[in-house]
């Protein structure tokens, strides 16, 4: 999937920047601002993301 960067802490919802666009995102657990994520799915206007280790 595409990659992005967290702009608002995901706990489990927040904002990520993907290709210059802000998206509402969901994840399992918590991901901090500045962490890189990969997009696993697009659900309407939200994306499901996973932290890149």
For the regions a protein language model found, what residue spans apply to each?
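Terminal membrane-proximal soluble interaction domains of membrane-associated proteins
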Residues: 1-53
């Amino acid at each position: 999937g595409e990659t992005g960067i967290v702009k608002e802490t995901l706990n489990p919802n927040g904002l990520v920047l993907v290709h210059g666009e802000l998206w509402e995102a969901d994840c399992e657990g918590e991901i901090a601002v500045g962490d890189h994520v990969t997009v696993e799915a697009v659900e309407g206007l939200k994306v499901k993301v996973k932290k890149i280790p």
